Amino acid sequence: YKGYGVEYLNKISQYTGWRYEYINESWENQLADLKSGKVDLICNAQKTEAREKDYDFSCMPVGTEQAVLYTSEDNEDIYFQDYEHMNGKKVGLLRDSYQNEEFEQRQGEKNFHCPEEYYESEQDQIEALEQKKVDMILTGSISKHDSLKIVDKFGAAPMYIMTTKGNTEVMSAVNNALEQLKAEVPDLTENLTEQYVMDKNRNSKPLLTREETEYVKSVSAPIKIGCIGDQPPLIYTDKETGKLDGIYIAFLKKFSEISGIPFEFESLSPDTDPIEAAQSGKYDFIAGITACQEMIDEPEVHLTGGFFTREFQIVTE
């Protein structure tokens, strides 16, 4: 076995000396087995008032998980956060999952309603979606389904380790290990999230709304980008090819590949004023700038979110 929870439990075992036997059961059966004492631990579970009556939880969370709503990759009827078209669509839920409560709240917030079907495992949910028994399925973000299309993400909540109510011996050992891990490996949760959650999302298709999808389809001419150089390795002209290259260009080409929006690059001199270039009407975007307060305060210029951070150093003899 491997994954986020397994990695966390392996770290805990370095302090407890435990060896694990993993039981592959439906989520409903896992909860029942834990309640009866048939199993000792469940890793990665949300804390609720109802669950606290039957289970004990670790003293601190071991990560954060969102609820993720998926549909089939070829479903052209539902787009990201397309609540109007989600209304009335049938959704497959995992029985006794915390995310079900989050989804109920989401429907109320966004004013849509979906008939629900319940399944014993995520595999059952996926099969129901593939067989067109449901239009969407809801899972946690720790599980990643690359062959499906994400249509909503919401309800980030902390995850804990659970044990049987009153099992103080096991939970005390878990809590002691977690406290030591926090002191000795403070970035463990961040690193595991990077490895098992963020890495899975990097090559995903963009989460486009219906309006954004229609815009991409409507783009006939390349978006013109003025690129301020010469700033190797960020942006520069390759001497052999005569073409623009560097981190900015690689990023924009990848963005173009994922989004389907074509770009056309034009080199600008290093002393180009980015605000004047943006206001000239010759370019749709200006690349190769460092955000500063002047640009942030400029009402006629809009900045994208940052995607690259660099440090400057003063060097002297």
Task: Annotate each language-model stretch with its function.
Residues Y1-Q46, K53, L93-R95, E109-E127, ...:
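Extracytoplasmic small-molecule ligand-binding "clamshell" domains
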Residues V6-Y15, E73-N100, G155-E211, I249-I258, ...:
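Extended ligand-binding regions for polar small-molecule ligands
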Residues W18, S26, K47, M60-K110, ...:
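A conserved helix-loop-strand patch within extracytoplasmic ligand-binding domains
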Residues K35-S36, Y55-F57, E73-E76, K90, ...:
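Extracytoplasmic/periplasmic mature domains of Sec-exported, cell-envelope-associated bacterial proteins
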Residues T48, S97, S143, N167, ...:
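Flexible, active-site-proximal loop/turn residues at the rims of small-molecule/cofactor binding pockets
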Residues A50-R51, C59-E76, G140-L178, G229-Q231, ...:
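Periplasmic-binding protein-like
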Residues G63-T71, L93-T164:
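Ordered, small/hydrophobic-rich secondary-structure cores
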